[in-house]
Amino acid sequence: MKFIINNNILIKNLQKISRLLVKNTSLPILDNVLINIKNGMLSLTGTNLEIELVAMIQLSTEHISGTATISGRKLLDICRNSLNSSNIEMQLNNNKMHIISGNSRYILTTLPYDSFPVHHDFHHISEFFIPSDILKKMIEKIQFSMAKQDVRYYLNGILLEKTDRSLYAVATDGYRLGISKFFLKENIIPFSIVIPRKGVIELYRLLNIPKQPIKVLVGKNNIRVHIEDLIFTTQLIEGQYPDYKSVLLENKNNFITLNSKLLKQSLLRAAILSHEKFCGVEIHIRNGQFKVLSDNQEEEIAEDRFNINYTGNTVKISINVYYIIEILNSITSENIFLFLNNANNSIQIEAENDASILYVVMLLKR
């Protein structure tokens, strides 16, 4: 193996791949990057077993095909300490990687490439194209609703499913629920998968690119996304995701229109003295007035109110204040619709000018 590559190009791709590298005493090869040259294409692969990322780079200079694995962190450090515009020359000799950068020389140890774990056996059951900005938005609007280290492991991620002609992304921790959807023009094979939390976070980072169509391949145990010159693959979570549609309101006649900014400001004021553990506030809606009350373990009290256009029945509910604030942070419309549940166990929130997202938040027992 032998090739020459511009340091700018190499470091740009190594920075993305290095996020996956882990120091594992029982499996040291996970700290390595798999380097492969075939048919004039250089591929760099990093994995943490759950997620795999492959960077594809077209070589424009003379090269010799081959495969090797070397420490990703050490290679990245070499690149970072080299001139940005310089060329990096790499050559494999007697299972040692010889690297030349300007006036510097390095010799790195390699590990057997055939023990590097890769997703060679990926087979997809469904595929589609989606604009990168749309998929990024779908994740962005609901990812805060994902569970963190929940024993119900299927909640520690996002449900991605295709039903009818729409693609749905769903996240819930059992106390709140976020749903975003996108209409697919093409008719694709239906699927329902759960992407793990770490995979969701990494995919969201990779989608920070100019708007362009990206290809998504859905497998039985993995999902693969082609993003520019990157191939992202992550394992899926097994298990039956809860029936999220059962908590959605069928009757939407009982709702209140609220100014997003006024509501957020009021909640932030009340949150100052909310209970540190439960973060609960009481909301009273009556006679055209929206009132928020909070207290804490030190018997301190906060109250804030603002006027609204509402003449219906008196409403009294208790709710986690930060759940609502996080929702308001993700909504860009001037107003929101707050739908009341007749069973008085949850509320549903929708943006005034964006029908593609909605949220459900469970109420606290008073």
Swiss-Prot record:
An annotated Gene Ontology molecular function: DNA binding
Subcellular location: Cytoplasm
GO BP terms: DNA strand elongation involved in DNA replication
GO CC annotations on file: cytoplasm; DNA polymerase III complex
Function: Confers DNA tethering and processivity to DNA polymerases and other proteins. Acts as a clamp, forming a ring around DNA (a reaction catalyzed by the clamp-loading complex) which diffuses in an ATP-independent manner freely and bidirectionally along dsDNA. Initially characterized for its ability to contact the catalytic subunit of DNA polymerase III (Pol III), a complex, multichain enzyme responsible for most of the replicative synthesis in bacteria; Pol III exhibits 3'-5' exonuclease proofreading activity.
Family named by the database record: Belongs to the beta sliding clamp family.
Assembly description: Forms a ring-shaped head-to-tail homodimer around DNA which binds and tethers DNA polymerases and other proteins to the DNA. The DNA replisome complex has a single clamp-loading complex (3 tau and 1 each of delta, delta', psi and chi subunits) which binds 3 Pol III cores (1 core on the leading strand and 2 on the lagging strand) each with a beta sliding clamp dimer. Additional proteins in the replisome are other copies of gamma, psi and chi, Ssb, DNA helicase and RNA primase.
Protein name as annotated: Beta sliding clamp
Gene name linked to the record: dnaN
